[in-house]
Each structure stands twice: as C-alpha cells, then as structure tokens.
Amino acid sequence: MELLKLNRSAQGSGAGPGASLCRAGGALLNSSGAGNLSCEPPRLRGAGTRELELAIRVTLYAVIFLMSVGGNVLIIVVLGLSRRLRTVTNAFLLSLAVSDLLLAVACMPFTLLPNLMGTFIFGTVVCKAVSYLMGVSVSVSTLSLVAIALERYSAICRPLQARVWQTRSHAARVIIATWMLSGLLMVPYPVYTAVQPAGGARALQCVHRWPSARVRQTWSVLLLLLLFFVPGVVMAVAYGLISRELYLGLRFDEDSDSESRVRSQGGLRGGAGPGPAPPNGSCRPEGGLAGEDGDGCYVQLPRSRQTLELSALTAPTPGPGGGPRPYQAKLLAKKRVVRMLLVIVVLFFLCWLPLYSANTWRAFDSSGAHRALSGAPISFIHLLSYASACVNPLVYCFMHRRFRQACLETCARCCPRPPRARPRPLPDEDPPTPSIASLSRLSYTTISTLGPG
C-alpha cells in the first residue's frame, strides 16, 4: 500500500517522482518508513509544538501497536484452539487477523522509527519488504472481507446450493488464493521502491520511484478500483440481500406463529391446511437452538416415527416469558453475526478511505495535496490507517458472545487454578453419612431394579 507518499522531500525539481515538495527554507520534521517526509517552514511551528506533536504521535503509535499485536494474537490463538469456533466464517476471520498482525509487526515499527530518527537506516531490502508486506496485508484484508460477505450470502440466501461447497477445505483454498492473488498484485511495489537521499546530507528516505507520472496515476486509480470501490459495491449488495432475507425469514416465522395461535383457538375450521411457504432460499433448521455462528440452515430430512417421538419428548419447551422458537433463535443469531460483520466492514473502509483518497489526490495534484494535508492531517490519516489493525479484536470482544467465552476458556486453560485439597477426616471422626438425595436415589434404583411386586 502506498502509505503516506504525500509529503516527500527529494532532491531534484520538476513534477517527476523525485520532485521536491518542500518550499525554500523548509525544515525536515519527520520521515516515514514508507518513504514520507513532512516539510514545513520553521517559522510556523515552535519547538514546543513539535515536541508535543511528537509525544502524541509516539503515544498513539505505541497504543495502536500493542492493541494490534495483542488483540490479533489472541484471535489467532482462540480461533485455533477452540473447536466450537472452527467454522467457515471464522476461517476467513482468522486470515484477516493474520493480515492485521502482519501490518502491525512488519510495517508500524519501520514507520515510527524513521519519524523519530529523521532518516531511514534499515537499508534497501527492508524498504522493499515493508512496502510489499504493507500492500499484501491491505489486499488480503479487503479480499477476506469480500469472501466473508459472499460466504454469508450463500449460506443465508442460497443454503441448498451452498451446502455443496461450504466446507473448511474450500475455505482454505479460497484463503490461499487470496494471499497468492495479493502477493502477485503487489509485485510493483518492491520493483519500484528504493532508498534515496533526502533533503539533508545524510538523511535517507524510502520512496516509490515510478517510471512516469502517468504510471503512478494509473496505479493509484487501479488500487482505488480493485481494493476499494469494487469490493465496497460487492459487500453492499451482498449484505443488502442478506438483510432482506433475514427480514423475510422473521416475517415468515411471525406469520407461522400467528396462524398456529389462531388454529389452536379454533379460528380455522376444516382441518389444518398447509402453512405459509418459507421465503425464497430459506429452509427450516433441523432442530435445536442455533449457535451464534450458524453457517446457514440445513435441509430437514424426513424422520422415522421413533425419532419423532424422541424429539417430542426431548424438545425444549418455551419458558414462561415466551422465549423464541428454534427457527427464530437461529435467525436472530444470524442477524447478530451479520451485524458484527457489517461493523467490521464499515470500520475497515472508514480507516482506509482517507488514505486512498489522499494517494489518489497526490497522484494527480501533488503540490495541492501537500499544501492541504501537511502536518496534523497527514499524521491523522497515517494513524487511522494503522488503527484498522486493532479494531477487529475490539469488535469481537464486544459483539461476539462465543468469542468472549472462548477467550475465558483459553485463559483458564493457559493459567489453570490449583485444585483445592479436600480436608482429610480426623481419626476419631465418623465417616460421612449419605445425604437424603443419595438415599432417595438408592431407593429409586432398588425399586426400579426389583420392579412391581
């Protein structure tokens, strides 16, 4: 990802890739590991302002870095150890966590340290690697969100067709394809990335040196289309159809409940006719309350009489408050999952929209972008793009009940409590007498064994 190439100070003049964007008398304030230098006239900024801005920037970087690394490592561990969370959707969320962790570990330190030191000291290899890994991470995150949206659409709106290919092995193949496609798409970054001298005598910067301004513009527009607009349209359409299907499913269940109540009260005469047809692409669950991560509905196969009798005996009865039926509970669970995924998508695009816009603006009007975005705006855009790596763990913790439970179970497994030692009876104490419940259980067992007299 071409991160913050807006305020670059390079030797040379003109409108080419090496053109200087700093005015005469400008002072070098910071340099980014991605090759960005911010230059502003010293008369506009005092030493106290620069120190305060630097302290705020370092603090925010540290907080975002720790939250990104800790949160995504926790996601990877929990999804890897919990068998209940090994679903198709969570497989894509696991890939998303890996890409976010890659963005935090491989890019953030090499962006902050050059800002503090005023030069890029890591060499050409690290410069090319950081630029490449940053682009791969953003591309994988975008494609993973698209894959999740399409998978949810197939599971909820086309459940019969989705059951043929909706498996973890198919999800693994899709994940591998997203990483390979992202790796091929970002090949131009290491090819056209280099370390070159900056404004100072010994200052270096990691920059993209495109062959021409037209190539840079074409590349910016291509990334804007492939990684922002097209995925955004696909996800908007998919989640719109999903919301419509869930709404129709809830309406269908409400109509079924009202018709059942009317029949039980004798409102309908002449026998029980066929109920309302389910919405298009929907089906009834096979039974049981749905989990929070249901992957769709299953086809209800015909059962034998013994199975039906056993189901009638063991079926859960609604509570006194009139709890939701299994089908309604499954739809509500799907609604919660879709709501969580929508929050993830919205936050991702909110974090990256300013950067895509800034890069496209710079590709067509570098001097205007520099004048408008120098200083605090570009720092905010920078931090906002990196904040996308730490928002997903927060969303999971606040909106995913099973993930919270799995986190607690994982922590309990890693830090088990020592078992409490039972007090030993003293030698002069009598042995414990059986309780009333034990006697009742013993009497019931004896009577059941002997049978009727």
From Swiss-Prot:
Q: List the disulfide bonds.
A: 127-206
Q: Is Lipoprotein found in the keyword set?
A: yes
Pfam families with a match to the protein in the record: 7tm_1
Protein's cellular compartments: Cell membrane
GO BP field: digestive tract development; gastric acid secretion; gland development; pH reduction; phospholipase C-activating G protein-coupled receptor signaling pathway; positive regulation of cell population proliferation; positive regulation of cytosolic calcium ion concentration
Q: Which residues lie on this side of the membrane: Cytoplasmic?
A: 80-87, 151-170, 244-339, 401-453
At the top level, the lineage of the source is Eukaryota
Give glycosylation sites per the record: 7, 30, 36
Q: Provide the family line.
A: Belongs to the G-protein coupled receptor 1 family.
This chain's protein is named Gastrin/cholecystokinin type B receptor
Show the taxonomic lineage: Eukaryota, Metazoa, Chordata, Craniata, Vertebrata
- GN (gene name): CCKBR
